[in-house]
Design a protein with these regions (language model features):
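Pre-P-loop entry segment of helicase/translocase ATPase cores
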Residues: 1-22
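Conserved P-loop
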Residues: 20-89
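Residue-level preference for the first positions of well-ordered beta-strands
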Residues: 22-24, 54-56, 100, 118, ...
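A short beta-strand-to-loop transition that corresponds to the Sensor-1 phosphate-sensing loop
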Residues: 29, 61, 104-106, 156-161, ...
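Inter-Walker segment of RecA-like/P-loop motor cores
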Residues: 63-117, 216
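Walker B catalytic acidic pair
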Residues: 122-124
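ASCE P-loop NTPase helicase motor core
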Residues: 126-203
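ATPase catalytic-site recognition across NTP-hydrolyzing enzymes
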Residues: 188-227
């Protein structure tokens, strides 16, 4: 079994991700979104009945993928015998033949030709606007429904103005086939109130609202309501 006990919001996300093929999740900093999505990918990879299951975590840079996600993958597979890690390629090979790759969005041409049974796109607003519609979405097409299992894409991140992540957030709010969720620090209880007060007192208001209150309006040039 995976040594992971989800928090309440993480359990909500797992339930939603199990139902919806597409999901956009906006979370405050340190909410646990990366831990949740990696464990979701890991669970699905271990349980998949497809031949050669392939799951992916895509970050804006190689360094971010390694720094943010690699150690978590090792931590949560520590009790699973037969796992093999390729440090150079940031690849986890599971004993059932499934594979989880950590990928970088720095050169999208290197991603062309892959197939994916499930992918997390972390901070897509820091990547090319074409990387999902032209590269990732086609990779989800041919194996959807194989052995009764859907392929899926999960977008996670923190707001950074009106970029492509903001566009996907608005799409998810309007499209019933998409799941959309926002978790603000003032609502989740993940970070103690005392720590939030300390952060608010030491950060510019826009920065605090963006990082902890999930504001897409903070630090947007020309925004009418920037606070």
């Amino acid at each position: 079994s995976i040594p992971y006990t989800p928090r309440a919001i993480q359990a909500e996300l797992h339930a939603a991700w199990s139902v919806h093929r597409y999901s956009v999740v906006i979370c405050h900093r340190r909410a646990g979104k990366t831990v949740a999505v990696l464990n979701h990918l890991l669970r699905d990879a271990l349980m998949s009945k497809k031949p050669n299951p392939r799951f992916h975590y895509l970050a804006p840079t190689y360094r971010m993928a390694k720094t943010v996600a690699w150690d978590y993958l090792k931590q949560f597979t520590d009790t699973i015998p037969g796992c093999k890690f390729n440090e150079t390629e940031l690849r986890l090979d599971l004993p059932n033949g499934a594979r989880i790759n950590l990928l970088s969005g720095e050169d999208e041409t290197k991603l062309r030709g892959i197939y994916s049974d499930g992918i997390c796109i972390d901070e897509c607003g820091l990547m090319s606007e074409t990387i999902y519609p032209e590269v990732i979405r086609p990779a989800l097409s041919d194996r959807n429904g194989l052995n009764g299992e859907k392929t899926y894409a999960i977008f996670i991140g923190t707001p950074l103005g009106h970029n492509v992540f903001y566009d996907y957030y608005n799409k998810a709010k309007e499209d019933p086939e998409w799941h959309c969720a926002m978790y603000r620090a003032s609502e989740t209880g993940v970070i103690p109130e005392e720590e939030l007060r300390a952060a608010r007192s030491s950060m510019p208001e826009d920065a605090y609202n963006q990082e902890f209150e999930c504001s897409f309006e903070a630090n947007v040039p020309g925004a009418v309501y920037s606070k």
